[in-house]
Amino acid sequence: MRSKSKRKFLKSIGSAGIFFAGANLPVWAINFSANASASDQSYNLLKPDQNNLMLIKGFTSRVVATTGKKSFKGSKYRWHKSPDGGATFPTSDGGWIYVSNSERSENTGGVGAIRFDSEANIIDSYQICKRTSRNCAGGLTPWNTWLTCEEHPRGYTWECDPFGQKKQIKIPNLGMFNHEAAAVDPETSIIYQTEDSGKGGFYRFVPQEKITGMGQLLDVKGKFQVMQIVYANKVQWNDVPNPLAKMKNKKNDFDLMKRKENKGISYTYFQRGEGAWYHGGKVYFATTRTNEVWEYNIKENTCKPLYRGRGALAKPDNVTVSNTGLVMAAEDRDNMEICGISKNNNSAFPIVRIKDHHKKSEVTGPAFDPSGTRLYFSSQNGKNGKVGITYEVTGLFNKLS
């Protein structure tokens, strides 16, 4: 434990961090068999490099975007403020696109994109979503679109074209609440969503048909449901009467499940549900307030903590998974690290640390290029609390375990 803030935070955690609403459920309803090891492995981060990043030996970094500056000289787009959640998309020429949310309020948010060629040269930069608010995290889809989530109680999820050729689409089917992130099962097109609030639900939208292209989510019929963990990690999904229920009193019905039409529905609530990512039949998501990363196994229909805050990782926020299945989480402040969760014993270990006193910032938007050798992420507000910086780190991530 390396900082006073971490020691204080971890000391305050006395429970598993999941709670039950709408039903009196027994304490033994959750089997916490996935406790993190007390001792974390370490790859011994080196001294800060020229970009003030502490990296594993053999890894290198570069800055690809800075708030207010052009990433590509031939573009009109200047990189946005408050870069947040992100993802990458392959292109037909062997390159890829990295998309990044802008977590700004009052319809000044949106999503920006950087396009790379097959040699990782930046060849374009542009905006794919605009005039939205507090675009926090989101989720990539199997049909190659980006779902960007508005983090405010009247927020929606918007579908965007990473190539910037089609207009953004608001998706009411995915509810109106304090959205954080989304993850899509490619087998069924079911969309899982987190809610960033003190008593937020973990939701899913089950479409009646498989989604194959942009815009189909707008009209498809389906069920909107909330998770309830009922016994030994087993899950049941309960229908939400009105996923578009309006907030009338911020103090009493900020959370979707506390709004009048939805009260009385049993559900398990999570404290500050954050980033989410699909990989290999599982959905991983973080809860920042309780310092945990969760694993929902779709086939087994179980949900349990993969990591509980007793080690290197504190205040997990955005989540991603490497090509080899290593779950990684970015910290909301604390030590400004991206940590991996070991596949051997579920302990956490730092992979990247941002130095140089980024005290008013957080690590956001981790995502790999298609090869799995380049990791993109941002310091949301940089050293001065105003200028976001987006990085690329190159290394043998597939060797980490």
PLM segments and residue spans:
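Blade-level signature of beta-propeller repeat domains, shared across WD40, Kelch, NHL, RCC1
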Residues: 367-401
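Structural motif
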Residues: 107-112, 154-158, 200-204, 292-294, ...
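Blade-edge beta-strand/turn elements of extracellular beta-propeller
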Residues: 48-67, 74, 116-129, 158-178, ...
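Beta-rich, blade/repeat-based domains predominating
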Residues: 79-93, 131-142, 176-189, 264-281, ...
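N-terminal export signals
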Residues: 2, 8-31
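Conserved beta-strand positions in repeat-built beta-propeller and related beta-rich domains
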Residues: 98-104, 148-151, 193-196, 285-289, ...
